[in-house]
């Protein structure tokens, strides 16, 4: 694996990713793993009266490999119910600063609750720093199959530009692209540190729809306790 090869692949597939079917607006992943880290994560995406929530717990198995399991629940109108389960694996492919761009990979397997519907997704994670600015890109490839699900391959992209103002507050702008998703908007995030390496990471943002198929406004929230 070389930097030139990965960069060429990323530049070739980016236009295809943005033009193809899209994943739901969620979050932007970073390509790093901290050895011995454990976390409990909650996040929510809300649009047009619907709320999708995830509750997960994860741990680093090595200094390059992190795994996390999630419960997925949705509130649609007056109904709140369990929607599915997800297993996520994140792999750090290069050391931070080893190349001009830092590289990682993410693999997710999701199963619908009480249904035989499955979803397998993988993403190439890229991050680059320019002084206080940090640029991050996630390029997704997803395959769905199972009961009452049309077998199909979908792609999407999530992009983030973040300014490292202070550890407690970092403003950013995010873009999510796919055939059914075009959204852009401001995001804020930060870390609240406690003793003995524990911290609370938070994110909040509003993504504005840029196409008729995308909700006018999507709210995303995230809280992640790392220990």
Residue ranges with predicted function:
Residues 1-25:
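Cleavable N-terminal export/targeting peptides
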């Amino acid at each position: 694996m070389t930097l030139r090869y990965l960069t060429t692949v990323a530049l070739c597939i980016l236009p295809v990713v943005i033009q193809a079917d899209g994943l739901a607006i969620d979050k932007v992943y970073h390509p790093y793993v901290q050895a011995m880290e454990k976390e409990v994560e909650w996040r929510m995406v809300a649009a047009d009266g619907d709320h999708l929530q995830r509750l997960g717990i994860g741990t680093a198995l090595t200094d390059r490999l992190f795994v996390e399991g999630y419960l997925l629940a949705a509130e649609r109108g007056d109904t709140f119910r369990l929607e599915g389960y997800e297993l996520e694996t994140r792999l750090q492919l290069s050391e931070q600063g080893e190349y001009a761009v830092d590289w990682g990979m993410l693999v997710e397997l999701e199963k619908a609750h009480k249904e035989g519907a499955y979803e397998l997704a993988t993403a190439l994670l890229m991050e680059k720093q320019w002084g206080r600015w940090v640029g991050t890109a996630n390029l997704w490839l997803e395959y769905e199959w199972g009961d009452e699900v049309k077998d199909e391959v979908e792609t999407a992209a999530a992009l983030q530009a973040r300014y490292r103002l202070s550890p407690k507050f970092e403003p950013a702008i995010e873009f999510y692209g796919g055939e059914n998703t075009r959204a852009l908007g401001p995001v804020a995030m930060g870390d609240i540190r406690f003793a003995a390496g524990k911290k609370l990471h938070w994110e909040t943002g509003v993504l504005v729809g840029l196409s008729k198929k995308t909700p006018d406004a999507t709210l995303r929230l995230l809280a992640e306790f790392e220990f």
